[in-house]
């Protein structure tokens, strides 16, 4: 029987399925009960498609606000909170016959670089690693997580073996996968690699095939996106005695045990389990509740909120978000939906993308023309690739916001939670939503209008030393 695997961060991302907010929203809602419902909901919708294994959740910690890949994909920078919420999310998945995967061992979120582009480093000392990432992985192993995905990340305090003078990533490190993870940490589940196409993995050997074989030898049981030649090559090298049969036996035992654990060996198993109307309603309610409980008021020092049609009728909404890879303008299009939500609620809205330097004369008058100027900042991972800071036109919008009368300015981040203190520390009203989707927009409007209270608590330290001078 086959394992069918998907990524499915933020819910099952297909039409007709239920979108969930980013993982950090779960951290802001800070409810183990909702974490379980999140996992269960994703599992039920996965089962309706025949999916029995997800590469989720992210178990990395946001220790470096400049990390471009973890950010809102992670629940927190706090290991205790991460263990509490992730263990329930995993339980929700696995109680409902979907294998969970935690990633990216030995832990991302320390480096300021992206393992899609290069091999990155978890530079923590042994003591610090055991207090942070090591603790999260160790505790979730004890809780019974089925799979672990190593990242293309090094762990210098532990590693000694080198390839061409450099420490290899975990996906190529026998020390980290077999020595640390399988033996010292007693992980008996399946090790599934991160994508073989990422630059953090490629280029360590003369060709991709040799790297893939080396990854299997290091302790990866299932490779994500290897070449077609990979399996035949492993078979031939086992027959020649170049790869120990014990390595294959270990991988087979782990994969077989996972299939048995999740019922794939049961002859009466349901390949596809439809979601009932009652379950669908519960799933939608879970996503809605997480979203409503996550939106976080970081500060409202001059009491601009709640908004009302009496005092805030005329609004300028400024969309601050870059064009993503190959012209993908998803975040901007979603912000247009948020504009429509304001209009539906009776506001007179002008909407524009960024305020540029050449508009300086116009921007000086903006706070006289409008009751409020709201900067909607959507800076999310890989939209586009690169650091999560603001550049070019978006940076000019920061210039504009900080040049305006702050009594009229509100900043809302629909992505990275660090934007407010990084760029807008003098803006007195600042909100984090963690996600940029229709459900978040709807909840945000109700909260801005005072129909719902702010309930979210920041799951990460916003007063990070990087932003304190």
Task: Tell what function each PLM region has.
Residues 16-28, 64-75, 114-120:
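Surface-exposed, active-site-proximal loop segments in enzymatic domains
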Residues 28-44, 79-83, 127-132:
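Glycine-rich anion/phosphate-binding loops
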Residues 2-6, 10-12, 52-57, 99-104, ...:
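Structural recognition of the beta-strand scaffold that forms the well-ordered cores
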Residues 8-10, 59-60, 106-108, 152-154, ...:
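Active-site-proximal loop/turn and secondary-structure-junction residues that shape catalytic pockets
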Residues 77-226, 230-236, 240-250, 254:
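Second-shell residues forming the walls of enzyme active-site clefts
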Residues 14, 173-174, 183, 204-469:
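Preference for extracellular/luminal or secreted protein segments
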Residues 1-18, 42-62, 82-109:
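Glycine-rich, aromatic-flanked loop segments that form ligand/cofactor-binding clefts
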Residues 1, 32-48, 250-253, 257, ...:
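Active-site-adjacent structural elements in enzyme catalytic domains
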